């Protein structure tokens, strides 16, 4: 459901661009899209505005927006791979609430980092913070599951890596790049905040199941 919702919002956002001949370029981010610029300005999360109590709704709207097809595709791949098991564990309604809370947790840490490091006027969009919460929950609930991963050594091969290793390395990467102030359009601290939120939910859920003897 969340995957479909993100895809629908993406194409609705870019709908005005389809009237122009350059629309394939805007979908892949190779040409600036007037429509996405307007949408980001209104529904993207801007830390400075949130701090002033403005546009609080962007905590939710920003996590369903994507800048281009590559941005959307990368996020939806992670949501597709890791989301189904977590959703089956939590149940549909709880999973939706968990996803939204993870997005808020991700945005909250991003806001704090943006205010501390600068960039508080730059809007943020994307589902990656909320999806990082899904990764955090998966890290706790399915640590021994194997993740098929493309590895580039002297040749390209596929290796089955335990989730605890794959996601652990992913988190360390996000934390380190966030700590050195790396940018490049990636909200590293949002990923950290979402992942930690997911871990908290995962640990709480596992403790709840143990109390019930499940």
Predicted stretch roles:
Residues 1-214:
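A detector for small-residue-rich transmembrane helices and their helix-helix packing motifs
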């Amino acid at each position: 459901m969340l995957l479909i919702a993100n895809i629908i919002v993406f194409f609705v956002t870019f709908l005005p661009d389809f009237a122009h001949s350059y629309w394939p370029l805007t979908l892949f981010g190779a040409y600036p899209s007037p429509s996405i610029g307007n949408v980001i300005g209104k529904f993207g999360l801007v830390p400075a505005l949130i701090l002033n109590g403005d546009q609080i709704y962007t905590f939710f709207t920003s996590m369903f927006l994507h800048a281009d097809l590559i941005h959307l595709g990368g996020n939806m791949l992670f949501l597709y791979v890791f989301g189904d098991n977590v959703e089956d564990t939590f149940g549909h309604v709880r999973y939706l609430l968990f996803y939204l809370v993870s997005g808020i947790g991700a945005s909250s840490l991003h806001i704090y980092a943006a205010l501390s490091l600068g960039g508080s006027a730059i809007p943020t969009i994307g589902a990656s913070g909320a999806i990082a919460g899904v990764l955090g929950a998966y890290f706790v609930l399915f640590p021994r599951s194997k993740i098929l991963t493309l590895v580039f050594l002297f040749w390209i091969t596929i290796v089955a890596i335990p989730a605890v290793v794959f996601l652990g390395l992913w988190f360390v990467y996000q934390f380190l790049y966030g700590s050195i102030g790396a940018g490049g359009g990636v909200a590293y601290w949002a990923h950290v905040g979402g992942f930690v939120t997911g871990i908290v939910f995962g640990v709480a859920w596992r403790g709840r199941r143990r109390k019930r003897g499940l």
